[in-house]
Amino acid sequence: MLTRVFARALAPEVRVCGVAPGPVAVEPGQEERRAAETLLGRIGSPDDVAEAVVFLAGADFVTGTSLFVDGGRHLQSMSARRP
């Protein structure tokens, strides 16, 4: 919501986007459990998040949105879960 508010207030001079990362750095011994929380079955890397930031920085026609970089973890709370 905050991303959209700022995008409306600052356009067209400024583009506002958010990045919502999932598990990247996890406690030792938690890798398997945290990876199971994502649809892709792994935790992310710092490079995964950095690539999303680079994409948004160069996307001249994108504003007011947040990009989930979480391996699909945000979808796990939906009623249609992975079998």
Q: Over which residues does each language-model region extend?
A:
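A short, exposed helix-loop element centered on a Lys and neighboring polar residues
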Residues: 4
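Alpha-helical segment proximal to the catalytic Tyr-Lys
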Residues: 8-12
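Conserved SDR Rossmann-fold cofactor-binding beta-strand/turn motif
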Residues: 15-25, 68-70
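Conserved protein kinase catalytic core
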Residues: 26, 76-77
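Catalytic Tyr-x(3-8)-Lys segment
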Residues: 29-48
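Generic structural signal for alpha-helix termini and adjacent loop/cap motifs
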Residues: 41, 58-60, 78
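C-terminal substrate-recognition "lid" of short-chain dehydrogenase/reductases
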Residues: 46-69, 74
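A short alpha/beta connector and helix-capping loop motif
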Residues: 79-83
